[in-house]
Amino acid sequence: MPAVTGKLAAASLALALIAASASTASAQKKYDTGATDTEIKIGNIMPYSGPASAYGIIGRTEAAYFKKINEEGGINGRKINFVSYDDAYSPPKTVEQARKLVESDEVLLIFNSLGTPPNSAIQKYMNSKKVPQLFVATGATKWNDPQNFPWTMGWQPNYQSETQIYAKYILKEMPNAKIGVLYQNDDYGKDYLKGLKDGLGAKAASMIVLEESYETSEPTIDNHIVKMKATGADVFINITTPKFAAQAIKKISEIGWKPTHFLNNVSASVGSVIKPAGFENSQDIISAAYLKDVSDPQWKDDAGMKAFLEFMTKYFPEGDKLDGGTIVGYGVAQTLVEALKKCGDNLTRENVMKQAASLKDFRTEVLLPGIKINTGANDFAPISSLQLMKFKGEKWDLFGDVISADAGG
């Protein structure tokens, strides 16, 4: 009997050890809704239709990039299930799609949804649900507010910073400028306008001769451009989305107006704005960049650009490589993958935000040299540097230094 007892004791000890190791393994793995041993479910909302549909290519690029990641084994062995819906850049529709993603699809997080009004419409909802609204595709300053909105984080340089850089340039190079501003009549446009005024400081009132707003429902902004020229403005600040940016460039040429033209970064795509507007109409436009430009020959031997072009050829051959949206989608998707890798087996929503807020000197393959991604518990603005550029021939030429442009939030 003693031998049998010994065997039973050994067997029960072995079972206890197996149970203990299993519980240790499960203790190490933490999941919230949307994550399992095999999958990470990520939601996204894009304007695949409507007035801002040019940006839909960002979502399509992200879907292709996650397909690449899945083919390469996923993130820590988990495949990405990317669920992307159309909101037509309509905030009520964004709310509907966000609820669907969170409550029906049960995603772990919503990633890189596009537009200031759409994201503003779901910010309180996302924070009340404690679901990450991560790396939103808008540069509004309000996304850098971890104290009041700890579940919302931006990605690109903020709009106020960008127009502050333009203001500094104008004050230095054109101190007697008469400035006309065309801006979209929503949070997006007003954020840019505030940055410009803050950058001009006391001179804003005397230098700005016209502030003209437009609605996204307008079919054309031609009348606003004609009105702008009539003021005698010699500097034009163009705060628009791609469709209207291209219209403005064409109309300025058509009526023979020759201001120094500043075009906001989000409408500086060669593929979706400059080319349709006409290269001949776009000469000497000034903008700012934080990402490499595919059309710029200086990057032809760059390892990061080569990797991007190989990705496009293999995973998104129908995508326009010249469209700035493809570079954006690629860069922001790489940033999300980095944050999720850092989560390890702790895929709770809280840890996703913690890791997203712990990025140090991270570089995607498509950021300009000297620009890095840094976040912290009190810094939800991953990218805060830009470089000025001028359109020459069929491409943007960078000039000056990389400028750090932190504006409060």
Regions found by a protein language model. Give the residues of each.
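Periplasmic-binding protein-like
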Residues: 101-114, 134-136, 179-183, 232-242, ...
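Immediate post-signal peptide segment of exported/extracytoplasmic ligand-binding proteins
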Residues: 27-44, 71-79, 171-178, 346
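Beta-alpha junction/loop-to-helix N-cap segments that form part of ligand/metal-binding clefts
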Residues: 28-31, 39, 54-60, 72-145, ...
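Extracytoplasmic "Venus flytrap"
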Residues: 31-63, 85-92, 114-115, 182-191, ...
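Extracellular/periplasmic Venus flytrap/periplasmic-binding protein
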Residues: 92-96, 103, 141-144, 149-255, ...
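Segments of small-molecule ligand-sensing domains
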Residues: 314-315, 319-327, 337-396
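Short, low-complexity disordered leader/linker segments with a strong preference
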Residues: 1-41, 403-409
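Extracellular/periplasmic periplasmic-binding protein-like sensory domains
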Residues: 252-328, 402-406
